Amino acid sequence: MNNLYQRDCLRLLDFTSLELQNIITLAQKLKQYKKNNKEIQLLKKKNIALIFEKESTRTRCSFEVAAFDQGAHVTYLGPGSTHLGTKESIEDTAKILGRLYDGIQYRGHHHSTIEILAKNSKVPVWNGLTEKFHPTQLLADLLTIKEIFPERKFYEIKCAYVGDAHNNMGNSLLEAASLVGLDLRLVAPKECWPEKNIFKFCKEQIKNKKGNIICTENINEGVKNVDFIYTDVWVSMGESQEVWKKRIELLSSYQVNSLMLKITNNPQVKVLHCLPALHDQKTCTVKSILKKYGFKNGMEITDEVFQKNQKIIFEQAENRLHTIKAILVSSLLKTIKF
């Protein structure tokens, strides 16, 4: 019996440490099947609803391709294409979608919305991103880390997340570290540290593992001897210019660049980025943002560092597909048989 059957994935703490690592192991197996053109369609006749209140590239494509690979059908419900929370309550929408579909993905503005969907739909609900958590991204990150260091335990791996940690990525990184025992350093100004309650909880949980979690403003302390430096964009579309200005001023000295890599004292240090990255000026939008705030060579990461690490970064992005596929298979099948 598959103990993840009919389970939601709203945040990583929905799983135990063993369950999380089993998902990663399943993702490795599914990835190998796809690479060898030996995909086994386990989700035939399954129907999946994809609710996107926010635009998406990697998340939407990963859910759609994962479903198609496994023989499932999807319905894309984009921004403004449903009555969710406007003409119809979230509860009512959840109840009808739960009757029509075998599972629901939600990517939107409020974590409370996905909690209501999960409570009322009676089918598995998966979090493609909310303001609180981004669990499917961290599943891909853990798979990527495991692929690079297959022989190491997670507690033997040091990862510094540099930048804004007061967001869904910071929260999900904390939860991931507390479950697998990663040695995690959140390197940011205090204003960009995670909420105290989730940090305190995850710090307490990791005591049962061999890893560690710290927050520090000190870049030298935070990145010394790490195996990975991880970063994300500092600004999001839809936020006010005032928010952008304040955050960029806070984070300007936390750019991932060649000097920071030298500070690690690890010539083999790897760089992760969950994308999109403001590393070059090849789009009008990014070009105008970088020019406005005085950046000539990328914002949160320089183009030089991005290009040197692009193989890992794009592998990390591809791993969204394989880990999401593992979540779909795990939650929609009573028994997983290959």
Curated annotation (Swiss-Prot):
One cellular component term (GO) for this entry is:
cytoplasm
For the ligand (carbamoyl phosphate), the binding residues are S56, T57, R58, T59, R107, H134, P135, T136, Q137, C274, L275, R320
Q: What class of enzyme is it?
A: transferase
Q: Name one GO molecular function term.
A: amino acid binding
Q: Which InterPro entries match?
A: Asp/Orn_carbamoyltranf_P-bd (IPR006132), Asp/Orn_carbamoylTrfase (IPR006130), Asp/Orn_carbamoylTrfase_sf (IPR036901), Asp_carbamoyltransf_Asp/Orn-bd (IPR006131), Orn/put_carbamltrans (IPR002292), OTCase_ArgI (IPR024904)
Q: Name one Pfam family in it.
A: OTCace_N
Q: In which pathway does it act?
A: Amino-acid degradation; L-arginine degradation via ADI pathway; carbamoyl phosphate from L-arginine: step 2/2
The record's section on PANTHER family has: ORNITHINE CARBAMOYLTRANSFERASE SUBUNIT F-RELATED, ORNITHINE CARBAMOYLTRANSFERASE, MITOCHONDRIAL
Family, similarity comment: Belongs to the aspartate/ornithine carbamoyltransferase superfamily. OTCase family.
The molecule here is called: Ornithine carbamoyltransferase
**Source organism of this protein record:** Buchnera aphidicola subsp. Acyrthosiphon pisum (strain Tuc7)
Q: Which gene encodes it?
A: arcB
